[in-house]
Structure formats: C-alpha cells, structure tokens
Amino acid sequence: MEKLTTITATGVPLRRSNVDTDQIIPAVFLKRVTRTGFDDALFYAWRRDPNFVLNQPEYRDGRILVAGPDFGIGSSREHAVWALHDYGFRVVIASRFADIFYGNTAKNGVLAAIMPQESIELIWKMLEEEPGRQMTVDLETRTVTIDDVVLPFEVNDYVRWRLMNGYDDIDLTLQHEDDIAAYERMRAEKFPFKPKTLPAITEEAETVESAREPEAVEWAGPLADR
C-alpha cells in the first residue's frame, strides 16, 4: 500500500451530510471483488447532474474531499472506499464518519480526517471562493493548511501509523511471517495426527445399469410357459 505522509492537492467541497455508501457507489456496481475499476461508479447518480461538483473542471483533479457530517453511513461495503481511492481521493475530511467506513479507509490507503464542523464550513467557503484551490494535509503534524490558514484534525494513532508506513492487512500479517512458520512447525510436531492432503486415488469406474432398462430375467418356475 502506498505511504501517505503529506499531500498537497485540489480540495473538493461536498456540501452534503449523511452520505451513505449506496450514494458513494450504488449496489449495482458491486459485482466485482477487485479493488480497481470503480472510478466511474463513484457518486454515479449525482454525477449525472452537470452541476455536480465533480463535473466542474476546476475540481476534476481533486484528491482531497471535504464532506458533511456522518459520511460513509449505510451498508458496510468496502467498495465505497475502493471507489474513492480509485477515483484519486487519498483524504476525506468530515466532522463524523461511520465506524465501519472509517475502519475500511485505513486498510485501503485513504485518510479519514475528523475536524469540527466549524472548520469544515471555513474550508468549504475557501474552496468555493477559489475553485481549484490547493490545500495540504500533513499526517505528521495532523494539520490542514490552506494558504495561511492552519487547522488541526483528529486521526486515530493506529490509523496514522498504518497510513504513514503504508501497511495494509497483508503487510501487517507478513511482519509475523517467522512466527507463523514457527507455529506451523510446532503444530506438525505436536499434532502429527492432523489430517493431511493426499493425492486422489483413481479407481476404475464401475458399470452402472440403468434402472429404466433392467436386465432380462429368466423365469424357470412352474408358470414359466404362461
């Protein structure tokens, strides 16, 4: 996973609250399990409106999304974060996030930065006054900077550590590769009776008679001639 320490990019003001995961990416697009190819599906219904913020040329290269409170509510689909990341967003700023969505962001290289709503309102105003305005998000100092305005944000220490080091779940697991190998060796020695995968035994196929076509039966009894 790509490390995230400091990013300077165009900020995108999304003046909407209670944005749920179905609005982020509709369920009809959840037929794939890969993490890429979802950029066109992000905010699909809203992007059909020519006045939607992402359709404005000044914001098309935006990588920092500034949204209203309770972002990412609804179903727990991880595709919502995949779509944001695939579009290019590395940071989402809001005053509140849904818990599961917040957890999914850290696993996929997206920072969910928490700021007071008053700070969000100020950022919205500045971004709308000058569309395409650049802003800097610094994980090291936990600050957002726009021109001479510096605003602090909150981020979980563990999430911050993961993002700054670029650790996804697989990276974290591989840090214990030696321990896992040692455990498997111990288990094989201590429990030698554990089931093992054996090659398939090939046997000759048996001939199966059809129940609809029974074998001819010879009757040798006293009524055989009738």
Swiss-Prot record:
GO CC field: 3-isopropylmalate dehydratase complex
GO molecular function: 3-isopropylmalate dehydratase activity
Record's signal peptide: none
UniProt keywords, alphabetically: Amino-acid biosynthesis, Branched-chain amino acid biosynthesis, Leucine biosynthesis, Lyase
One BP term from GO: L-leucine biosynthetic process
Disulfide bond entries: none
SUPFAM superfamilies: LeuD/IlvD-like
Record region (Disordered): 204-226
Gene3D superfamilies: Aconitase, domain 4
Superkingdom as given in the UniProt entry: Bacteria
UniProt pathway annotation: Amino-acid biosynthesis; L-leucine biosynthesis; L-leucine from 3-methyl-2-oxobutanoate: step 2/4
Annotated catalysed reactions: (2R,3S)-3-isopropylmalate = (2S)-2-isopropylmalate
Enzyme Commission numbers on file: 4.2.1.33
Record carries keyword Amino-acid biosynthesis: yes
Keyword Ribosomal protein among UniProt keywords: no
Listed Pfam families: Aconitase_C
Annotated family: Belongs to the LeuD family. LeuD type 1 subfamily.
Protein role: Catalyzes the isomerization between 2-isopropylmalate and 3-isopropylmalate, via the formation of 2-isopropylmaleate.
PANTHER family noted in UniProt: 3-ISOPROPYLMALATE DEHYDRATASE SMALL SUBUNIT, 3-ISOPROPYLMALATE DEHYDRATASE SMALL SUBUNIT 2-RELATED-RELATED
Quaternary structure annotation from Swiss-Prot or TrEMBL: Heterodimer of LeuC and LeuD.
Record protein name field: 3-isopropylmalate dehydratase small subunit
Organism: Bifidobacterium animalis subsp. lactis (strain AD011)
